[in-house]
Curated annotation (Swiss-Prot):
Full protein name: Co-chaperonin GroES
Keywords annotated in UniProt: Chaperone, Cytoplasm
GO biological process assignments: chaperone cofactor-dependent protein refolding
Lineage: Bacteria, Pseudomonadati, Pseudomonadota, Gammaproteobacteria, Alteromonadales
Record-linked CDD domains: cpn10
Listed GO CC annotations: cytoplasm
Role noted for this protein: Together with the chaperonin GroEL, plays an essential role in assisting protein folding. The GroEL-GroES system forms a nano-cage that allows encapsulation of the non-native substrate proteins and provides a physical environment optimized to promote and accelerate protein folding. GroES binds to the apical surface of the GroEL ring, thereby capping the opening of the GroEL channel.
Subunit structure of this chain's protein: Heptamer of 7 subunits arranged in a ring. Interacts with the chaperonin GroEL.
Species in which this protein is naturally found: Idiomarina loihiensis (strain ATCC BAA-735 / DSM 15497 / L2-TR)
Principal subcellular localisation of the protein: cytoplasm
Similarity annotation: Belongs to the GroES chaperonin family.
Name of encoding gene: groES
Stored PROSITE patterns: CHAPERONINS_CPN10
InterPro entries linked: Chaperonin_GroES, Chaperonin_GroES_sf, Chaprnonin_Cpn10_CS, GroES-like_sf
Amino acid sequence: MKLRPLHDRVIIKRTEVEAKSAGGIVLTGSAAEKSTRGEIVAVGKGRILDNGEVRALDVKAGDKVLFNEGYGVKTEKIDGEEYLIMSESDILAVEE
């Protein structure tokens, strides 16, 4: 299945990072926090402004980002892979 996000939404594949304790022990399962980093795999056409114009997004597919996984973030499994669908405003930074 292929999804195309609408408007100012993006689809992100979470980047898994190895979590370690202060003592260097690798944490797994519930002891490890979920990463808030990922790679954008698809973007919508843009935000619809009050005057009807569409403002293109500042991010693009392939960007590596840091995001806020909050109330408006939807998790979806597609072909066995987990993806996040969120608004561009939930993205905090782009890795350069």
